[in-house]
């Protein structure tokens, strides 16, 4: 009968290894063969199974058939361009709209420098970066929903 030592945070050496960046594998267990040989194929095959099953279950036709002789009421871009479309549609000056769109990548590039003194990777311990991310996500969703509505209620979404 072998003795298996369970890791505990009361052990000084375990805390030292966790402090130096050891991951979830106990006592420096290598990634090969456990992670690379067993866990990765399970995740890859599970993802492939989900994609194939969803593709088989989905019907072939979505929406109305295309009619080249009938122009739609409003031509909308693809869904991933909705927030940008909403900015250009609602801002009175197109130059300001373009500057707002250029400000998004500039703002995203500055987020790491805001909290560069914070060494934690846990998002709950990086409140400024998490708040900027959540605010940007909510604004993008708000603008994306507003792009599908008429222009007079697009910014308020008809709520107020």
UniProtKB/Swiss-Prot annotation:
Cystine bridges: none
Main function: Component of the cytochrome b6-f complex, which mediates electron transfer between photosystem II (PSII) and photosystem I (PSI), cyclic electron flow around PSI, and state transitions.
HAMAP family (UniProt xref): Cytb6_f_subIV
Subunit annotation: The 4 large subunits of the cytochrome b6-f complex are cytochrome b6, subunit IV (17 kDa polypeptide, petD), cytochrome f and the Rieske protein, while the 4 small subunits are petG, petL, petM and petN. The complex functions as a dimer.
UniProt-listed Gene3D superfamilies: plastocyanin oxidoreductase (1.10.287.980), Single helix bin (1.20.5.510)
Family statement drawn from the similarity comment of this UniProt entry: Belongs to the cytochrome b family. PetD subfamily.
Protein name as annotated: Cytochrome b6-f complex subunit 4
Cross-referenced InterPro entries: Cyt_b/b6_C, Cyt_b/b6_C_sf, Cyt_b6/f_cplx_suIV, Cytochrome_b_C_euk/bac
PROSITE patterns attached to this UniProt entry: CYTB_CTER (PS51003)
GO biological process annotation, one example: photosynthetic electron transport chain
Xref: CDD domains: cytochrome_b_C
Location within or outside the cell: Plastid, Chloroplast thylakoid membrane
GO cellular component entries: chloroplast thylakoid membrane
MF-aspect GO terms: electron transporter, transferring electrons within cytochrome b6/f complex of photosystem II activity; electron transporter, transferring electrons within the cyclic electron transport pathway of photosynthesis activity; oxidoreductase activity
Keywords, comma-separated and alphabetical: Chloroplast, Electron transport, Membrane, Photosynthesis, Plastid, Thylakoid, Transmembrane, Transmembrane helix, Transport
Topology term for the membrane: Multi-pass membrane protein
Regions that span the bilayer: 36-56, 95-115, 131-151
């Amino acid at each position: 009968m072998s003795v298996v030592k369970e890791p505990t945070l009361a052990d000084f050496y375990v805390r030292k290894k966790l402090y130096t960046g050891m991951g979830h594998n106990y006592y420096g267990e290598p990634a090969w063969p456990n992670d690379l040989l067993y866990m990765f194929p399970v995740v890859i095959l599970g993802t492939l199974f989900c994609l194939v099953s969803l593709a088989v279950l989905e019907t072939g036709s979505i929406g109305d058939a295309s009619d080249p002789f009938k122009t739609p009421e409003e031509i909308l871009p693809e869904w991933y361009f909705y927030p940008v479309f909403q900015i250009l549609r609602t801002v009175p000056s197109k130059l300001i709209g373009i500057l707002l769109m250029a400000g998004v990548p500039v703002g995203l590039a500055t987020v790491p420098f805001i909290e560069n003194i914070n060494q934690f990777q846990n998002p709950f311990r990086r409140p400024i970066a998490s708040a900027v991310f959540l605010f940007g996500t909510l604004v993008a969703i708000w603008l994306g929903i507003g792009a599908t509505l008429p222009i007079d209620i697009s910014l308020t979404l008809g709520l107020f």
